[in-house]
């Protein structure tokens, strides 16, 4: 960043017309910035800051600035005054530097000195890349909004941005820079779950700065997820809020990330509509992607959403947190020093970027394939009246574009499925935007009802724009970043199935983008461009110009694509019934229910599922595999997808190599082998990243985004390449490189994202009957063939892949898999479709197919009885066909004639797939009521009553043999003893509906069931059975049914009335085409529509191409001539951590193992969650069609489904695991499969692991190449063979069974006499029974021992199972709790190592030792006489809170504490158990939770107790003569209960969850310990989320019975029940027993007095003796003077620890101090405060706030502890601020007098922030004509103040109905306002001044020196910033301060005020009293009435003065003139009046 401060210029030459108006332009590297002009000035002063963003490029020696000074002309060109060039080489360096450039000469055009000079200050900040979320970072601010507003029009960038372009024009480089860091973190956002979860969003509104407006009362409203919170109303332009809002939501993560956080600031004083002052919007996802999911103390730039041309409306400082389940909020560090708070560098913006107005110009051209959305009723009516119906276009689409809360809609185009809008949507936003995606929703407009959503798609800004920051930082590239750009390109829409029904769509949510769309629903053609401009667009919606429409034509060019899918198998079916078929579609092509495309062979034939003999069903396709083909037309985007596939190959290879390295590290393979694996990884990365991506040049449809993405990818690949080369040469440790290598993988995965992928996904549907059942979506690029070669083709192109279909809206695969498909898909351009031949396996055959139908009429078969059927039809019988009209398409020719070819797959018998079967037949008799039973007319029937053959006629089918000798009656039913069941018919039925077992007189029918079992004849081969079956079939190929539409069967029955047979004619491809000829079949075969002309149009349309079954498309299949026989062995050894699904806390697991069309079941293992099957499942003679090499590359998966066996009811699903077998094509291959743990998944939840592997062997004909069979444990139950099963070793397991805790009742009775059973590896050991759990919860003998054969490899280690058995009456021993421990490696130990780590330490063991003689701490009385007085004085200055604040870094609150040398404590921001150094305080014994009962699907199992104990595992020698290793658990403490004193110190709460409607809480503490409860309700703290409790509680308890200390925070409510905020539980037993001394933290110093008095029971020397004894060291030896101790073989000196430290008077004896220093080196828990998270059952895994506290535990057997700490909160002190308003000057003259003079009636108002109700104001200085006012008026403001924290305490009721006062802590600020008094209207506000009393602006001595420059600006680097001082330190100030007002966004001087400010404490105020105003006591100082001019008066109260000072002064000469004129007029009048008399008298009496 380069900052130029243009200060002033001198001696500017005059112009011809007078003084110039100078303006300065500063030019740096083609970028120009200007100052404002100064009118009519030869020595102008600008004092303006111009900033230049260096774009990451540091200055070099050639860098310079050009300064141009011109004379501003309103009209015409500015005239040059002078120029100067300033070299910047003196600023170069790594540090921030600022240099003055004074008296720089200005030169004219000829280079001559003009005599004028200019003064500059230039500051330089070198480019750096701190984290943008670090408030303390030195991130460089960009060009601010104000500066941007001042640019001239000539510098504005209005051009369209199509990428960075070359350097040159001003602004082009900055366009790329503008997009920097937009993609920060977002593109790497993890895949988000669609399962609703609990989230908590927290927003802390801290303060505002420079809010616009005068005399404002701002309030902030925060709106998220439909919830709104608002702050309290404040006053002033810089309000301080510090309010925290909580938003609890239950929503899916994907939806939450799109929610907007809206922060708006309103002026509550305004009643007008324009009270919105500014807003800021950001999406939740942006915050979630920040480190810690939080934005900490960042400034937001507010702007006016309506007026886009306006500048910044102020700043708001906030913190935002988004907490998911289990997330902990990061600690928020408060910053008290606002001087360091540089707003610009701490804006919530990417580093170095200014917000700029940009316009997103989104061009929406057209859409296609929009599905029907409206009912066809109106079209049907039109059709009836002879109109033309248009059912294809039953949709009225329009597009809604939404971004950052703004929405714009296009026009509605009625009845058009392919609309053309050709409109531009203009969205103007601030950029870079905090919102992530532009949402485009296509709606169907409805006149009467709500508009329906057709589909939704998004444009992600992070994917269509790039910062390039990471690349530029390392390569110096400046043009890798680019602003958002997209297309022209199609965006695909996905959602619910396209088929329209009049009913509500169950999958409607999918259309709104919630969940994965299951069907293609059209696409829209759009283009996005970004303009950088300040002026808003004239219209939000306008038409696209015709020129633009022509330009985008080339982007819509289509090419023909061919797709082939060969279905190899469909297995694992469970829901069987109707026949099944599969449909493949891409876009609309292939959708069999859609009539908009040509008919395609896109569906397989219907097939019926066959039982696999064990559990599942499969489709019997055998060697004839169904094939679907379709052709489609799409844009050729191979240049995009080739790059994606190539990058995916790189990423997958790197992923597999990373996993190989990780498994090597986990398996602890030798270092040289690990290095080989690692080198292979690095070498492959180097090789892969050399690859150049496909070139885009020359392609017609290349967009700007294509070019930019290619450039970005190339730079990233080269970056990874260089990093890999560097790592290969420099790396020394494999583990340390993994983090960087995984970052490479993340980068590669980001690069694979292709936003312009316009090719729709391939969708496979399973259709049963006519209903879509399950689907799979396959991205087209995965199967796309590329002509580029290499890895550009898709991963599965032409390869067989396994796909698990899923049900719509099922987020993950559930208990049932609809079907497992193995399918081979090839997709490619039709131009290269012959390349398909090289991928094709087998022989492709195509058949034309039709069915001949006949009915039985009068005993003869014929066509006359075919009601509604045709003689020849399709398979449904509904579409009429005729063989003469079948023509082979191009590339195909007939091969042979029409032949009868029966379809066997649809006619499977009930016994198909079974090895055992029971035939049944019913014997029927009837009678008249009361008569004799006689044979019925149909003597033998089936179960439905239909006629059947008699038992004597029924023969055993070929391949079967009878198991029973004869037919027997079935009496295992609800029948009588002879097997009869009885019924009665109710007309019109002729058969009974129900049957009963007892005969009644009214029964008229009875029947009994005859059964006979048969089984497969294993001696016969499948081929001989098939031949025999063919002989049974009808020779003519007929299949029969009882009625039309019923199920067909082979053998004719007497009840059959309908038959059909299939005719087929084969087509073969011509030699030139090969297998690719199958793509020529589009719309090839048609139905006969020439006959039956009476069929109307609608009927024809009904039978059109794709209705019902698409029967007129050809049947394509792939025939495999050769079948390969394989042999599969699946070795399933064991499982672990399965779900408990039985009430006894266990399961009875077994597994179905499925491979292709075969499956088998393991044995059932009862009552375990960790079954060991040790079983080999063998599938012999598995038929697989296709080349063995294909099977080797993509072998079929082995699927293992685990179930819990239940005696009653259905077996419950436990989970599914998939394993890929090792393929052996050559028996000589010497590779042994390795057992591996595979996860067991139930949906998306991991439910255990199974240890399994499998091998697939290509079998010889005689099977001679197969390995020998493993040994059998039982008949047909093979074990896992040696060499594959784990190698075991004799191992010792020592169990420390300490005790049981918190056992819950079992079957409503308490657990009283439990024992412990430990099982591992088939061995079992049981503990002694605890006689009374309530009295002694510990086991009497604590150590158990067992010898087990455990695997040597850690990977195969079985879990260890703990069971608790309760010994009850009558010999019952139920399992009342169990626990499985997986990872046993943490318990392994070396039995010969020292005993240091295996015995507990400190007090627990001390209790079992003889008691210490000295337990009383003797303190020598060495205090001076005045010690008590001194300590009292010190206590005022130093308290425990001083220690706390000194330790937390808040030094301004701790006074002189640090300077006095006192000790600090450790503040942990987590629980003490979570501190890594203390191992969870489980070093003596772990706590294992015990579980019981059935696991619910979505709930964790219930905890029913705890086991306290530990384990030690070590190998035993194989030779029994070798002595066994020493036992590990020795010297155990006594396990009897101990009585203890517990002190709980609660310091403060942090960010508590609000419980009241006002968003606050009234918290108090509740403590529960055993049966003791302390409810501190009386000391609740009202209305706060951050309460300072400062409370200490002391209780006594017995350990371990009362080990759980529960600390709860409750919300006090007066009238309703108190609500729990949250609670935390501390295990006191762990703290008591831990070797880390966690019972009482060790302080830094040993003090015998003062605030840090020693509080432990034992002195440091005693503690050190105990530590030495437990560690096996000799006792410590103390020197005589106590300054040296010998401990652990080393001498410790006191001087070592206390050198250069301040020693105060409270320290104890030297030997104790030295012992304490040694103790602090032993890793013990220090004196501390821990921060514990509060949890609630309402949101169990989300923090409800935190509690800072600690606990001390003292056993009473060791005597009384020391005195407790006093942590009572500090009390505020009373202070007074006295403000004397002396005078004002230069106040704005706001009024005009009646005589037209400018004047103001001035008065001054003032208050302290937070105490607005205590406003005070002066009297009025009337009629100030020059802005001067005289007052001599005193304000006195009392306030409560905390000197240590430098905050005011304000306590007041929020509402008049509030019960409690709310306490606020606000900075002490004085607000002074100048007002103009009006008698008959509202007073006018003139200006204000805000003074922070801690940083008070030092006033000017005279009014002339007082200016606005004294007011500090927001920029921390501003060198003109005014000096400030603390009024609390200076005590008083006097001088002139400026007041200002806001006018059009800028500050203007409103006046100057002369004041005296004085701060006094209460004592000083009493000593020096003073009254308010000039009232008594008027002293200190005495204020005399102001000597105001005589003109100062209120005019209507002083008429004389009004005449004298207003009338006389203004109109004096007028009055005098008028008087003289009046006298003159009177004189003339008198003269005229007297003259005639006088003249007549003179005439009459001349001498008179």
UniProtKB/Swiss-Prot annotation:
Residues 1-2012 are cytoplasmic. Its cofactor is Ca(2+). It is found in: Cell membrane; Nucleus membrane; Cytoplasmic vesicle membrane. Residues 2034-2048 are extracellular. Expressed in myoblasts (at protein level). Expressed in endothelial cells. Its main location: membrane. Ca(2+) 4 binds at residues 1556, 1562, 1611, 1613. One of its GO terms (cellular component) is caveola. Pfam families: C2, dsrm_Ferlin, FerA, FerB, FerI, Ferlin_C. Keywords: Acetylation, Calcium, Cell membrane, Cytoplasmic vesicle, Membrane, Metal-binding, Nucleus, Phosphoprotein, Repeat, Signal-anchor, Transmembrane, Transmembrane helix. It is a single-pass type II membrane protein. Mice lacking Myof display fewer large multinucleated myotubes and are impaired in their ability to regenerate skeletal muscle after injury. They display a defective membrane repair in endothelial cells. They show also a delayed endocytic recycling. Belongs to the ferlin family. This is Myoferlin. The lineage of its organism: Eukaryota, Metazoa, Chordata, Craniata, Vertebrata.
């Amino acid at each position: 960043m380069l900052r130029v401060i243009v200060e002033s210029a001198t001696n500017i030459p005059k112009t011809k017309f007078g003084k110039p108006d100078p303006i300065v332009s500063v030019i740096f590297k083609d970028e120009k910035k200007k100052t404002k002009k100064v009118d009519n000035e030869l020595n102008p002063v600008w004092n303006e800051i111009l900033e230049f963003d260096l774009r990451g490029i540091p200055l070099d020696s050639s860098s310079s600035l050009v300064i141009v000074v011109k004379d501003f002309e309103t009209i015409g060109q500015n005239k040059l005054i002078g120029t100067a060039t300033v070299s910047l080489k003196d600023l170069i360096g790594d540090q921030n530097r600022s240099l003055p450039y004074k008296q720089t000469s200005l030169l004219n055009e000829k280079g001559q000195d003009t005599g004028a000079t200019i003064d500059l200050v230039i500051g330089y900040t070198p480019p750096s890349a701190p984290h943008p979320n670090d408030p303390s970072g030195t991130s460089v601010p960009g060009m601010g909004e104000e500066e941007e507003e001042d640019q001239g029009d000539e510098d504005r960038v209005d051009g369209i941005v199509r990428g960075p372009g070359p350097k040159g024009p001003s602004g082009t480089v900055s366009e790329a820079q503008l997009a920097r860091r937009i993609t920060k973190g977002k593109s790497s956002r993890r895949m988000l779950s669609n399962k609703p979860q609990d989230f908590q969003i927290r927003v802390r509104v801290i303060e505002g700065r420079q809010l616009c407006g005068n005399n404002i009362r701002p309030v902030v409203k925060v709106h998220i997820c439909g919830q709104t919170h608002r702050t309290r109303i404040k006053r002033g332009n810089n309000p301080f809020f510090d309010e925290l809002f909580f938003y609890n939501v239950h929503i899916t993560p994907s939806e939450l990330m799109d929610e907007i956080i809206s922060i708006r600031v309103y002026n509550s004083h305004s009643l007008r509509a324009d009270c919105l002052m500014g807003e800021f919007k950001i999406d939740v996802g942006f915050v979630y992607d920040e480190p810690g999911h939080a934005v900490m103390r960042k400034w937001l730039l507010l702007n006016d959403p309506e007026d886009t041309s306006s500048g910044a409306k102020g700043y708001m400082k906030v913190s935002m947190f988004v907490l998911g389940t289990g997330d902990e909020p990061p600690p928020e560090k408060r910053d008290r020093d606002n001087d360091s708070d540089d707003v610009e560098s701490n804006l919530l913006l990417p580093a170095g970027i200014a917000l700029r107005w940009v316009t997103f110009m989104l061009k929406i051209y057209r859409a296609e394939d929009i599905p029907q959305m409206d009912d066809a009723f109106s079209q049907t009516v039109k059709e009836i009246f002879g109109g033309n119906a248009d059912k294809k276009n039953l949709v009225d689409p329009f597009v809604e574009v939404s971004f950052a809360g703004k929405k714009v809609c296009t026009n509605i185009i009625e009845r058009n499925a392919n609309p053309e809008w050709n409109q531009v949507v203009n969205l103007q936003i601030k950029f870079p935007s905090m919102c992530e995606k532009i949402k485009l929703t296509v709606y169907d407009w409805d006149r009467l009802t709500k508009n329906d959503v057709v589909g939704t798609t998004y444009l992600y800004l992070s994917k269509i724009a790039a910062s390039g920051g990471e690349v530029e930082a390392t390569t110096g590239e400046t043009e890798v970043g680019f602003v958002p750009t997209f297309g022209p390109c199609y965006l695909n829409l996905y959602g619910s199935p396209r088929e329209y029904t009049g009913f509500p769509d169950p999958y409607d949510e999918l259309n709104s983008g919630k969940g994965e769309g299951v069907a293609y629903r059209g696409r829209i053609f759009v283009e996005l461009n970004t303009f950088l401009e300040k002026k808003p667009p004239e219209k939000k919606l306008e038409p696209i110009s015709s020129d633009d429409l022509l330009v985008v034509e080339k982007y819509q060019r289509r090419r023909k694509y061919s797709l082939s899918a060969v279905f190899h198998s469909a297995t694992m079916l469970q829901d069987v019934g109707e026949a099944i078929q599969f449909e493949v579609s891409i876009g609309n092509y292939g959708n069999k229910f859609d009539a908009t495309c040509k008919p395609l062979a896109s569906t397989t034939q219907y097939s019926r599922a066959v039982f696999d003999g064990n559990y599942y069903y499969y489709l019997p396709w055998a060697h004839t595999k169904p094939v679907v083909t379709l052709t489609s037309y799409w844009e050729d985007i191979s240049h995009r997808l080739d790059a994606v596939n190539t990058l995916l190959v790189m990423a997958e290879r790197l992923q597999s190599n990373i996993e190989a390295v990780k498994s090597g590290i986990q398996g602890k393979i030798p270092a040289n082998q690990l290095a080989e694996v690692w080198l292979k990884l690095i070498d492959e990365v180097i090789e892969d990243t050399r690859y150049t991506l496909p070139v885009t040049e020359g392609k017609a449809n290349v967009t700007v985004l294509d070019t930019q993405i290619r450039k970005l990818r190339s730079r990233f690949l080269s970056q990874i390449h260089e990093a890999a080369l560097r790592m290969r040469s420099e790396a020394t440790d494999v583990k340390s490189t993994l983090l960087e290598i995984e970052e490479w993988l993340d980068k590669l995965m980001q690069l694979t994202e292709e936003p312009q992928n316009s090719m729709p996904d391939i969708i496979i549907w399973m259709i049963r009957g006519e209903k879509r059942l399950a689907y799979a979506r396959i991205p087209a690029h995965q199967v796309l063939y590329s002509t580029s070669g290499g890895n550009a083709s898709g991963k599965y192109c032409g390869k067989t892949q396994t796909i698990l279909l899923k049900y719509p809206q099922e987020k993950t695969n559930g208990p049932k898999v609809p079907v497992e498909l193995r399918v081979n898909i090839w997709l490619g351009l039709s131009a290269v479709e012959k390349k398909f031949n090289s991928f094709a396996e087998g022989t492709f055959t195509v058949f034309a197919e039709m069915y001949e139908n006949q009915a039985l009429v009068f005993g003869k078969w014929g066509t006359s009885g075919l009601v509604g059927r045709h003689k020849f039809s399709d398979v449904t019988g509904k579409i009429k066909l005729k063989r003469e009209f079948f023509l082979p398409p191009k590339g195909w020719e007939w091969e042979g004639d029409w032949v009868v070819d029966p379809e066997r797959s649809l006619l499977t018998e009930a016994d198909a797939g079974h090895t055992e079967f029971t035939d049944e037949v019913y014997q029927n008799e009837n009678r008249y009521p009361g008569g004799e039973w006689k044979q019925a007319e149909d003597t033998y029937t089936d179960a439905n009553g239909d006629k059947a053959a008699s038992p004597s006629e029924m023969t055993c089918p070929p391949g079967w043999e009878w198991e029973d000798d004869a037919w027997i009656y079935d009496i295992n039913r609800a029948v009588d003893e002879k097997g009869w069941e009885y019924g009665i018919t109710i007309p019109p039925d002729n058969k009974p509906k129900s049957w009963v077992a007892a005969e009644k007189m009214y029964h008229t029918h009875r029947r009994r069931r005859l059964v006979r079992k048969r089984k497969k004849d294993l001696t016969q081969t499948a081929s001989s059975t098939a031949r025999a079956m063919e002989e049974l079939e009808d020779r003519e190929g007929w299949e029969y049914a009882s009625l039309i539409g019923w199920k067909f069967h082979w053998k004719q029955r007497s009840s059959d009335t309908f038959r059909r047979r299939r005719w087929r004619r084969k087509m073969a491809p011509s030699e030139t085409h090969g297998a690719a000829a199958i793509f020529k079949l589009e719309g090839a075969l048609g139905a006969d529509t020439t006959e039956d002309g009476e069929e109307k149009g609608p009927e024809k349309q009904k039978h059109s191409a794709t209705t019902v079954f698409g029967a007129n498309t050809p049947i394509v299949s792939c025939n495999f001539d050769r079948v390969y026989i394989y042999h599969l062995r699946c070795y399933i050894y064991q499982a672990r951590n399965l779900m408990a699904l039985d009430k006894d806390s266990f399961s009875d697991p077994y597994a179905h193992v499925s491979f292709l069309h075969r499956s088998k079941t393991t044995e059932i293992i009862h009552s375990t969650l960790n079954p060991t099957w040790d079983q080999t499942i063998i599938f012999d003679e598995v038929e697989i069609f296709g080349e063995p090499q294909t099977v080797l590359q993509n072998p079929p998966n082995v699927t293992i489904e685990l179930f819990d066996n239940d005696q009653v009811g259905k077996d419950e699903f436990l989970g599914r695991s998939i394993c890929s077998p090792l393929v052996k094509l050559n028996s000589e291959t010497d590779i042994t499969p390795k057992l591996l743990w595979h996860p067991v998944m139930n949906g998306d939840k991991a439910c255990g692991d199974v240890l399994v592997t499998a091998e697939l062997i290509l079998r010889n004909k005689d099977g001679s190449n197969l390995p020998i069979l493993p040994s059998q444990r039982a008949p047909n139950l093979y074990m896992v063979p040696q060499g594959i099963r784990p190698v075991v070793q004799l191992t010792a397991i020592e169990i420390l069974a300490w005790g049981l805790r918190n056992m819950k009742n079992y079957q409503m009775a308490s657990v009283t006499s439990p024992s412990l059973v430990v099982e591992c590896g088939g061995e079992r050991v049981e503990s002694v029974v605890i006689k009374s759990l309530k009295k002694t919860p510990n086991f009497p003998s604590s150590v158990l021992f067992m010898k087990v054969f455990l695997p040597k490899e850690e990977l195969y280690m079985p879990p260890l199972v703990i069971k608790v058995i309760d010994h009850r009456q009558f010999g019952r021993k139920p399992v009342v709790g169990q626990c499985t421990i997986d990872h046993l490696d943490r318990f392994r130990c070396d039995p010969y190592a020292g005993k240091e780590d295996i015995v507990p330490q400190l007090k627990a063991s001390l209790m079992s030792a003889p008691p210490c003689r000295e337990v009383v701490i003797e303190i020598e009385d060495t205090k001076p006489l005045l010690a008590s007085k001194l300590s009292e004085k010190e206590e005022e200055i130093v308290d425990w809170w001083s220690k706390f604040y000194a330790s937390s870094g808040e030094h301004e609150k701790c006074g002189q504490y640090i300077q006095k040398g006192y000790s600090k404590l450790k503040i942990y921001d987590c629980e003490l158990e979570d501190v890594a150094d203390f191992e969870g305080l489980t070093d003596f014994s772990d706590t294992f939770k015990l579980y019981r009962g059935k696991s619910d699907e979505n709930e964790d199992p219930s905890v029913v107790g705890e086991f306290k104990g530990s384990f030690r595992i070590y190998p035993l020698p194989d030779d029994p003569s070798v002595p066994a290793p020493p036992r590990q658990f020795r010297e155990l403490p006594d396990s009897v209960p101990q009585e203890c004193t517990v002190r709980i110190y609660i310091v403060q709460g942090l960010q508590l969850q609000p419980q009241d409607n006002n968003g606050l809480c009234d918290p108090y503490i509740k403590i529960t310990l055993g049966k003791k409860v302390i409810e501190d309700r009386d000391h609740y703290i009202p209305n706060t989320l951050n309460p300072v409790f400062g409370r200490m509680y002391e209780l006594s308890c017995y350990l371990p019975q009362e080990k759980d200390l529960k600390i709860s925070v409750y919300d006090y409510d007066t009238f309703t029940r108190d609500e729990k905020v949250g609670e935390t539980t501390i295990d006191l037993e762990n703290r008591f027993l831990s070797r880390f001394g966690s019972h009482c933290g060790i302080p830094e110093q040993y003090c015998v007095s003062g605030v840090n008095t020693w509080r432990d029971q034992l002195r440091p020397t005693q503690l050190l003796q105990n530590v030495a004894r437990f560690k096996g060291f000799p006792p410590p030896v103390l020197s005589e003077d106590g300054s040296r101790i010998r401990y652990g073989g080393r001498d410790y000196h006191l001087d070592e620890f206390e050198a250069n430290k301040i020693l105060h008077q409270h320290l104890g004896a030297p030997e104790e101090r030295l012992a304490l220093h040694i103790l602090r080196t032993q890793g013990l828990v220090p004196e501390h405060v821990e921060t514990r998270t509060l949890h609630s059952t309402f949101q169990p895994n989300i923090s409800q706030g935190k509690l800072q506290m600690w606990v001390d535990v003292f056993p009473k057997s060791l005597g009384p502890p020391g005195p407790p700490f006093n942590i009572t909160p500090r009390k505020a002190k009373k202070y007074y601020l006295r403000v004397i308003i002396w005078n004002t000057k230069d106040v704005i003259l706001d009024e005009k007098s009646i005589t037209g003079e400018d004047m103001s009636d001035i008065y001054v108002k003032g208050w302290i922030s937070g105490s607005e109700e205590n406003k005070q104001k002066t009297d009025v200085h009337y009629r100030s004509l020059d802005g001067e006012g005289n007052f001599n008026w005193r304000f006195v403001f009392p306030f409560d103040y905390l000197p240590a924290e430098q905050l005011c305490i304000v306590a007041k009721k929020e509402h008049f109905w509030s019960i409690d006062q709310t306490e606020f802590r606000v900075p002490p600020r004085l607000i002074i306002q100048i007002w103009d008094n009006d008698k008959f209207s509202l007073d006018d506000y003139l200006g204000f001044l805000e003074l922070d009393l801690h940083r008070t602006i030092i006033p000017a001595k005279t009014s002339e020196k007082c200016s606005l420059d004294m007011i500090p600006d927001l920029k921390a680097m501003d060198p003109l910033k005014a000096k400030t001082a603390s009024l609390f330190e200076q005590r008083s100030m006097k001088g002139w301060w400026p007041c200002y007002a806001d006018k059009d966004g800028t500050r203007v001087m409103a006046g100057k005020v002369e004041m005296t400010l004085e701060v006094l404490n209460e004592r000083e105020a009493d000593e020096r009293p003073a009254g308010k105003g000039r009232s008594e006591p008027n002293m200190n100082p005495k204020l005399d009435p102001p000597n105001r001019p005589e003109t100062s008066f209120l005019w209507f109260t002083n008429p004389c003065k009004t005449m004298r000072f207003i009338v006389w002064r203004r109109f004096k000469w007028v009055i005098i003139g008028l008087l003289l004129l009046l006298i003159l007029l009177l004189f003339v009048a008198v003269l005229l009046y007297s003259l005639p008399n006088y003249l007549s008298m003179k005439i009459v009496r001349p001498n008179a």
